[in-house]
From Swiss-Prot:
This is Hexosaminidase D. Belongs to the glycosyl hydrolase 20 family. It comes from the Eukaryota. The keyword Nucleus applies. Inhibited by O-(2-acetamido-2-deoxy-D-glucopyranosylidene)amino N-phenylcarbamate (PUGNAc). Inhibited by galacto-NAG-thiazoline. The active site is at 141 (proton donor).
Length: 346
């Protein structure tokens, strides 16, 4: 699968714009979209405070899903449930659920109310995505894990560790998903799992509950290291893995023009990784397109600016390289005479 990531935490597109670019996504080779709603989802009830003033309405969400279906794009929703909780924990009414009082990034995994909060968010999103085969629960960059006072005390007890604390919250979230929605598989960013020893991973239930997404947005991947990481995850019990590249939003917090060459190299490197691991290992790749590095950050490249890069990257994945004939196809798709004119450098 080839999924385009829609990051809605900055300059979210209008539905009419999505109706124009979804056919392009499909024509370029995408067959799915990962929608990171953040505060653009129309949360209701006690979660209403999470929604932005310009959040999509339920009818607009349904229209987006309809447009995706028309263009044969499978939709995977994404809701952060551990790190990058700024849009939730910035609110005074929920600030007591922070791991560290000063920082709204990380959820306190010790409080029952924390799990109740994120499962309620999941449930509301799933209500509008009843047929979702996968659901992304985030869990990346949990920066302040273990630094709260409750965590410090807990970590002083043997055999507790940050890895155990991390895995226990992941397991709780994923267990809710599996129990409540048995036909939906949770996805999870892999960075918090990378340094956890294989025996600790296999000793938890996480490998039976989720499919990790290995992300790396660099132009020069450690190919051998990636192969070793894949092997470690497989030995730990994960049945399927995903990859995540970037077509924009990964080369600078205030980047305004997309360096296409960087992102093309990133995808060509991921093709090498895919070719070096067993065929039944990677289920698909998510082409991320970040709008902001976090909820409080400035905007990086906007989605329309990143479309040429997305076209290059999708076509490279589809054809397995970026030869002259593939380049010509992209130029034809975009209606431009030369891609070189669009290879901006900051």
């Amino acid at each position: 699968m080839r999924l385009v990531h829609l990051d809605l935490k900055g300059a979210p597109p209008k539905v009419c714009y999505l109706s124009e670019i979804f056919p392009l996504f499909r024509a370029l080779g995408a067959n799915g979209i990962l929608i990171e709603y953040e505060d653009m989802f129309p949360y209701e009830g006690h979660l209403r405070l999470l929604r932005a003033k310009h959040a999509y309405s339920p009818s607009e969400i349904k229209e987006i899903l309809h447009l995706a279906t028309l263009n044969e794009l499978e939709v995977i929703p994404l809701v952060q449930t551990f790190g990058h909780m700024e849009f939730v924990l910035k609110h005074e009414a929920l600030a007591h659920l922070r791991e560290v009082a000063r920082f709204p990034n990380t959820l306190n995994p010790h409080k029952e109310e924390s799990l109740a909060l994120v499962t309620a968010m999941i449930d509301q999103v799933m209500e509008l995505h009843p047929g979702a085969r996968w659901f992304h629960v985030g869990c990346d960059e949990v920066y302040y894990l273990g630094e709260g006072e409750t965590s410090r005390q807990w970590l002083q007890q043997e055999p507790n560790s940050k890895a155990k604390l991390c895995l226990s919250h992941m397991e709780a979230v994923a267990s809710h998903m599996r129990a409540r929605y048995p036909t939906t598989t949770p996805l999870m960013w892999d960075d918090m799992l990378r340094d956890i020893p294989e025996d600790q991973l296999s000793g938890s239930r996480v490998p039976q509950l989720v499919e990790p997404v290995l992300w790396d947005y660099g132009a020069d991947l450690d190919l051998h290291g990636k192969a070793l990481l894949v092997e470690k995850y497989r030995k730990s019990g994960f049945s399927w893995l995903w990859a995540a590249s970037a077509f924009k939003g990964a080369t600078g917090v205030n980047q305004s023009l997309t360096p296409i060459e960087h992102h093309l190299r990133n995808h060509l490197q991921w093709l090498q990784v895919a070719g070096s691991v067993p065929a039944d290992t990677l289920r698909g790749i998510i082409l991320t397109g970040w709008q902001r590095y976090d909820h409080f950050s400035v905007l990086c490249e906007l989605l329309p600016v990143g479309i040429p890069s997305l076209a290059v990257c999708l076509q490279a994945l589809l054809h397995g390289d970026f030869a002259e004939n593939v380049k010509a196809r992209v130029e034809n798709f975009l209606g431009i005479s030369s891609l070189e004119e669009m290879s901006f450098r900051r």
